Every structure is written in structure tokens, then in C-alpha cells.
Amino acid sequence: DFYLNKVFEDLKKMNLWDDTAIIISADHGENQGELNVWGDHQTADHITNRVPLIIRWPGITDTNKGSTVENKFYNLDLTSTISQITSSSQPDRWDGINFTENLTNSKSSNGRDYLVISHGAWSCQRSVRWDKWLLIRTYDTGLKDFPKYMLFDIEKDPHELNNLADQHKDLVAHGMYLIDEWIEENMYEADRGDPLQGVIREGGPHHANIYSKVWNTYVERLEKTDRKKHADNLRKYKGKPFSK
């Protein structure tokens, strides 16, 4: 905040403040204990993938100062929005949507019905965020003890402490339908296929690949440190999710 303020003050001194668009965002969040991940981003969950987006654009956001937009968007939608505002052409292959309407009216209903999130670096997961729900489907645990399905009520449980998958199998089924719909609309036409499935076929994330020497070393360490149950599950399921 301190250094941003210095930039803003300099813009004002140079009489550029009213001619400069300010956009603040990020690439990902950091879990602080959620899903037993500390100070890192290892899952396709809400905390990791909900990023800030603060926009001040003279002539666009003037009538909407200090407001919050609750609609759902991808980061890639920002590029499409900037293109629209600046009257730049957008390639037909771009998947982003324009959300300029939300910048002028925070009550706009112009948003995505749901968001699908993929993670293939520290685990192999695909999730879907809709309404107040988050469903996470785990394909490779990345040496953790994630179950196959995790369902969270983000409004009541923002830190993802209570997995409701067993209590709401109808919502799990609906979430998987949305994920399948997204895969059909996006991955079937991808030039190089589904990258998440590529990681799974190769044996899982690099640090937890079942074909690497690290795999057995880690499992042996678990056995030597009173975590034999977890070691047995990893040997049995080869990194795939298992029931607790």
C-alpha cells in the first residue's frame, strides 16, 4: 500500500492521475491452513484461486466508486474487457467475456454462471464454483490425503473445514455435470488436449510422481514417522484419492 501510494502521488504531481487506468490483481492466492496447506497454493480451492481485482478507470468507474461486484469472472475476462474499453480488436479464439457493464453498474447481472478451476502442479484437481458452492474433484492427491470429492458451502464455511459431499450427493452430481459440460466445451477443441489429463497420464505432479525415486523415499519416511496408515494408502492407491 505504501509504494502504491507513492506511485499514485507521482501520477497526481505529473497531472496524469485523471488519464491513467489503475488495475490491481494477482495470479493466485495463498492457503493459510485451508485443506492443510500453509503459505502455498497447492489445490483447486476457493482460497487459492479467488484473486483480487481492483479497477479505477477514469470515465468508466466514476459513477461506481467504492462498490463491490459479486459476479463471477475469470482473469482472462479482464483482457477482453480492456480490449473493449480501448476499442481494440479481440481475436475470435479468445474465450474471455467483456464485463465493462459491471464497472459502470455494480448491480449488473452480467457474469458467468459458474467457474471451473484446474490445478496440476502440486495435486491434480478440477473444481467448479457456482452459487455458494465449491466442488473439488481430486484425481491425484500429490502425496496428501484428499478424498475423491470435497463439497464446501463457501458462504458459511469460507475456510473449507466441513466437507459436505456425503450429505449432498445431489450437489456433487450437479457439480460434476458442470465440470463435464466445461470439458466438452473447452478441452475437446484444445490444440494439445487437456493438460490436466496429461499430468495424470505421466504419473502425477512432478514432486509426487509415482515413477520417481522421491515417491518411495517419501512413503518410507511416512512409515518411519508413525504415519503408516497414510503410507499404506499411498502404496495401495498410487496417489489417487481414497476414502478415509
Where are these regions (language model features)?
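Long, internal low-complexity/basic segments
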Residues: 164-244
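A structural signal for well-ordered alpha-helical segments within the folded catalytic domains
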Residues: 1-5, 48-49, 73-80, 94-97, ...
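C-terminal cap/loop subdomain of S1 sulfatases and analogous C-terminal strand-loop tails that border
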Residues: 28-34, 76-79, 84-154, 159, ...
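Active-site rim elements
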Residues: 40-42, 62-72, 85-91, 160-167
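Extended amphipathic secondary-structure runs
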Residues: 1-14, 22-23, 79-81, 241-244
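Short, hydrophobic alpha-helical segments
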Residues: 8, 12, 82-90, 183
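Secondary-structure boundary motif
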Residues: 13, 105-108, 166
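Histidine-centered active-site microenvironments of extracellular/periplasmic hydrolases
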Residues: 10-70, 74
